[in-house]
Amino acid sequence: MRILVTPTFERAVKKLHKQQKASLDESVRTIVGQPEAGETKVGDLAGVKAYKFRMGNLLCLLAYRVLDGNTLKLLMVGPQENFYRDLKRTEP
């Protein structure tokens, strides 16, 4: 499966510690194996899926879009607080 990333996603990953990146990698592997694992959003974020996972003690969300059967676009990762508000600002 082909994985595309946005600049917003890259910036967020750059700030993570090694253990946090390991937990993010595990979540990405889960999504690649099961693209339907995330919760489908409606309204302004139609077409976006959000996958919830733990990064240490923190509940985090990973927003992604399945472009076709073979391509996955990772949009944003971060803590739950104000996540959807920030996602609306970055995603047209």
Task: Identify the function of each model-found stretch.
Residues 1-27:
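Arg/Lys-rich, positively charged N-terminal/basic patches that mediate binding to nucleic acids
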Residues 2, 55-61, 65-92:
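Enriched for short, Lys/Arg-rich terminal
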Residues 16, 24, 45, 72-74:
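Generic leucine side-chain signal with a strong bias for well-ordered alpha-helical environments
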Residues 16, 28-31, 90-91:
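Alpha-helix boundary/capping residues
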Residues 29-56:
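A short, surface-exposed loop/turn module that caps and links secondary-structure elements
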